[in-house]
Amino acid sequence: KWFGARSAEEVIGKTDFDFFSREHALAAFEDEQRIVETGQALPGYEEKETWPDGHETWVSTTKLPLRDPAGRIIGTFGLSRDISDRRRAEAQLAHYAEELRHRNEELEEDLEMARELQSALMPRHYPCFPPAATSAESALHFSHFFNPSKAVSGDFFDILPLSDTTAGIFICDVMGHGMRAALVAALVRALVEELKGIADAPGEFLAQLNAKLTSILKQAEMPIFASAAYVIADTAKNQLRYANAGHPAPLCIHHEANAARALPLDRCQRGPVLGMFSGAQYGASQRDLSIHDMVLLFTDGLFEVEGAGGELYDQHSLMRAVNGRVNLGAGDLCREVLTEIQQFSANKQFSDDVCLVAVEVERLAS
């Protein structure tokens, strides 16, 4: 049947040259001659045949020397097993693997573009206060660290020049990781830009941001949220004004007290995360601002770090680290705290998205 014969008699006395292509038959003949000459079997090799109608078949063949009772080689014999289905399945798998590789390459290219775009959205140059001042003369100095755990991140920050003497510092952390979180972070950034007109009122700013974000996410049926903190440093009024949306409380280093503490909320609770409750309200608090005071805003990836023994670097650990370095400038303090946490980590690096922003008061306008 394999050769298209109706009975065994039709194949008796015929050779490979009667059934296969000349190339195939010659190769088989040479193999058999070598077996006769050497006595060495030819186990499990694969043969391909293209038939006159164009279809292809594969067999796994084992050929051995045929010996007479005295042990002399008088010919060869063999067994062939049809493996055409297996080879077709392997070819199909190879095709799927190549297709998957191509799609992965496209995905990697898209992720790289997304990473570059997200990087471009982050502040590359810090604003000066007033704008005509050099970075050394600016009333406010900034420093930041941004480390996505994947190609892109749900962490985001922005620095908003509200006047010649006032800056708004916004930070948020979108639930989850990767592309999904990064897309929502980009949406939050666009909304922050849209709401700059009310950015001098922290509570109202977060309330409007939440209302718009919640509306969009509900339409998209995306169960996702973001925590955020917003701090205004006003060097004309010597004042910090701030509001919080379910975010870790920023730390303020008071130069006169030579100590850091979490920014407290005045007669109001921390507001809920953004994107969950459309009518949420956010109370604003304020504190006096002195020269050389510093405020640190950060996402929870900075302190939710596990050590080699399973112990956790928590907010209390972070507070101790900052209090041990209150005499350093913003840049040096950030670098040393980050180094301490990375050295504490079991794998010496951050496993979550991390964003840290510091603002230091160099001079007051009043």
Where are these regions (language model features)?
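PAS/LOV-family and closely related PAS-like sensory domains
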Residues: 1-76, 141-151, 157, 161, ...
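… and, occasionally, acidic/histidine-rich disordered N-termini of signaling adaptors
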Residues: 96-296, 348-366
